[in-house]
Amino acid sequence: MQTKIFYLILFLLTAIFSNIQSNDFLTLQSTTSTRDSGFYDFILPEFKKKFNIDVRVVAVGTGQAIKNSENCDADLLIAHHKESELKLINNGFGLYRKEFMYNDYILVGPKSDPAFLKNNVSIESALEKIQNHKLLFISRGDDSGTNKKELSLWKKINFLPNPQTDKWYLSVGQGMGASLNMAVNKNAYLITDRATWISFKNKRDHAILVENEPLLYNFYGVIPINPEKCPNVKYNESKKFINWLLDTKTKEKINSYKLNNQQLFFTNIKK
């Protein structure tokens, strides 16, 4: 009898301990660029050290990350397409948005530059040249923040690419790394975020051709998921994370992150 009681108590203690352990993490739906650049590996150990809370990152395109958040598969969201993020808030799933850092987009292509883009052309002029000369262009085509940004830039020159009829425009449905590899292998043009480009090792004969334009700024926002819509959300832990992310020391940490002696993200937000 005593043996049965002992094992029952042991079982209950194990269940309680497991439940406590299982709550010591946050699920963060995220864009892929912050993961692929090594950003989370750089900053998240500091959060874990301070609060003893793990952050489990689910890195997908921004569109999918928002869908996952609407399915209540998140405590937090980090994305980089403000219009889509505000829609999540307006639909009641996100509570608010805090913009906390930025980098920028760039247009990369073959160093031979058949479109002659490197002569200080604007991004609109560059895309017009690519379209007019029907030069091979790779689009992520995955509803990510980068894909949405790219399409908005085509819209500025009153052009909507159609992969069915515009054979030079390849919509590949892939993440940033795979899309970059394809662009390099096919000698094609592509829009990418700078952080992923800096960390990308297979550049070969590709180079940055258009950069440093206000139109190409890339802003990142963090959004806590609404516990009234998603009862399992760990809201108190989410608040801790956001307050920590916006803290001066964390901003200094983010600004210090470099690869190849180049800063990847900036917390002094430009407007």
Predicted feature locations:
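Exported/periplasmic ABC-transporter solute-binding proteins
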Residues: 23-50, 63, 67, 73, ...
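Short glycine-biased active-site loop of nucleotidyltransferases that positions the nucleotide triphosphate
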Residues: 69-70, 98
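Boundary at the C-terminal end of the N-terminal hydrophobic targeting segment
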Residues: 18-22
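Bacterial N-terminal signal peptides that target proteins for export
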Residues: 1-7
